[in-house]
């Protein structure tokens, strides 16, 4: 019986290992293929059957920086993303704290806030474009930052409220009894306790803003787009420049992966808050 039990346990481990290997392959193969495409010649990319062994080249990256000036589009994305993340966290954190501990109608107000997030972006595309046109804000950082902040605030409030809810209300009551103001309670007591959750929220907002495409398409032109939108320019009447597409996709995805990797400790900490009592 002992031998049978050990064999069964070993078989299960092997099956689980095989399952996770297959799942990892499914997720990683598209990204790996994209990276390889950036280092291929255009002919190698469209050859049939596909070539897994090829002579690496930096022609795609050279085309990006010397012909298209892709670096300025990355700077556009970086400016919009960094400012948007800072503003979203700065606005959402106090609001989430208030909904969690200050007001007694936090649940009702949260539902009202989330209703704004339910509306699909394409439904407000025309009004946003008309408003930006009348205010002369097309092709500006301000327009992209404002719309990204407005779109991501409901999600950030919803997520951070759950983190603040994990802090026992007696801490706030004790601080208030000792003479602390609400702002002091928020900045000196609550924020350090939910820092992991706030940073986890910042990661999600960073990814959402960096990859945002719809409003960048509506509010910018071919003169000053963000990096994801600029990749449309590699589709010409003669075909798609796959080497440039692969190189651009690699450059666009690298900051997101690097940021998530750097913040992974806080990301896991934030997402597991309250899971252990």
Swiss-Prot record:
<dbReference type="GO" id="GO:0055085">
    <property type="term" value="P:transmembrane transport"/>
</dbReference>
<keyword id="KW-1003">Cell membrane</keyword>
<feature type="transmembrane region" description="Helical">
    <location>
        <begin position="189"/>
        <end position="209"/>
    </location>
</feature>
<dbReference type="InterPro" id="IPR000515">
    <property type="entry name" value="MetI-like"/>
</dbReference>
<keyword id="KW-0812">Transmembrane</keyword>
<dbReference type="InterPro" id="IPR035906">
    <property type="entry name" value="MetI-like_sf"/>
</dbReference>
<dbReference type="GO" id="GO:0005886">
    <property type="term" value="C:plasma membrane"/>
</dbReference>
<feature type="transmembrane region" description="Helical">
    <location>
        <begin position="79"/>
        <end position="99"/>
    </location>
</feature>
<protein>
    <recommendedName>
        <fullName>Probable ABC transporter permease protein y4oR</fullName>
    </recommendedName>
</protein>
<feature type="transmembrane region" description="Helical">
    <location>
        <begin position="140"/>
        <end position="160"/>
    </location>
</feature>
<dbReference type="Pfam" id="PF00528">
    <property type="entry name" value="BPD_transp_1"/>
</dbReference>
<keyword id="KW-0472">Membrane</keyword>
<keyword id="KW-0614">Plasmid</keyword>
<feature type="domain" description="ABC transmembrane type-1">
    <location>
        <begin position="74"/>
        <end position="263"/>
    </location>
</feature>
<feature type="transmembrane region" description="Helical">
    <location>
        <begin position="242"/>
        <end position="262"/>
    </location>
</feature>
<keyword id="KW-1133">Transmembrane helix</keyword>
<feature type="transmembrane region" description="Helical">
    <location>
        <begin position="15"/>
        <end position="35"/>
    </location>
</feature>
<comment type="function">
    <text>Probably part of the binding-protein-dependent transport system y4oPQRS. This system probably transports a sugar-like molecule. Probably responsible for the translocation of the substrate across the membrane.</text>
</comment>
<keyword id="KW-0813">Transport</keyword>
<feature type="transmembrane region" description="Helical">
    <location>
        <begin position="109"/>
        <end position="129"/>
    </location>
</feature>
<feature type="transmembrane region" description="Helical">
    <location>
        <begin position="213"/>
        <end position="233"/>
    </location>
</feature>
<keyword id="KW-0997">Cell inner membrane</keyword>
<comment type="similarity">
    <text>Belongs to the binding-protein-dependent transport system permease family. MalFG subfamily.</text>
</comment>
<dbReference type="InterPro" id="IPR050901">
    <property type="entry name" value="BP-dep_ABC_trans_perm"/>
</dbReference>
């Amino acid at each position: 019986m002992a031998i049978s039990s050990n064999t069964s346990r070993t078989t299960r481990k092997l099956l689980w290992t095989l399952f996770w290997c297959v799942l990892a392959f499914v997720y990683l193969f598209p990204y790996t293929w994209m990276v390889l495409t950036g280092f291929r010649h255009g002919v190698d990319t469209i050859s049939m059957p596909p070539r897994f062994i090829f002579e690496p080249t930096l022609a795609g990256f050279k085309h990006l920086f010397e012909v298209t000036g892709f670096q300025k589009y990355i700077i556009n994305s970086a400016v919009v993303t960094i400012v948007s993340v800072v503003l979203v966290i700065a606005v959402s954190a106090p609001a989430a704290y208030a909904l969690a501990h200050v007001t007694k109608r936090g649940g009702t107000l949260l539902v009202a806030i989330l209703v704004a997030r339910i509306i699909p972006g394409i439904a407000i595309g025309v009004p946003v474009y008309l408003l930006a046109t009348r205010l002369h804000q097309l092709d500006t950082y301000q327009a992209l930052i404002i719309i990204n902040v407005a779109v991501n605030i409901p999600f950030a409030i919803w997520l951070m409220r759950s983190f603040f809810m994990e802090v026992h209300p007696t801490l706030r009551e004790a601080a208030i009894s000792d003479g602390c103001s609400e702002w002091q309670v928020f900045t000196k007591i609550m924020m350090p306790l939910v820092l992991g959750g706030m940073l986890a929220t910042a990661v999600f907002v960073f990814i959402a803003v960096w990859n945002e495409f719809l409003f960048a398409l509506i509010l910018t032109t071919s003169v000053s787009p963000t990096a994801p939108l600029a990749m449309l320019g590699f589709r010409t009447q003669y075909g798609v420049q796959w080497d440039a597409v692969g190189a651009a996709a690699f450059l666009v995805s690298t900051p997101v992966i690097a940021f998530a990797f750097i913040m992974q400790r806080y990301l896991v900490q934030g997402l597991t808050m309250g899971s252990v009592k």
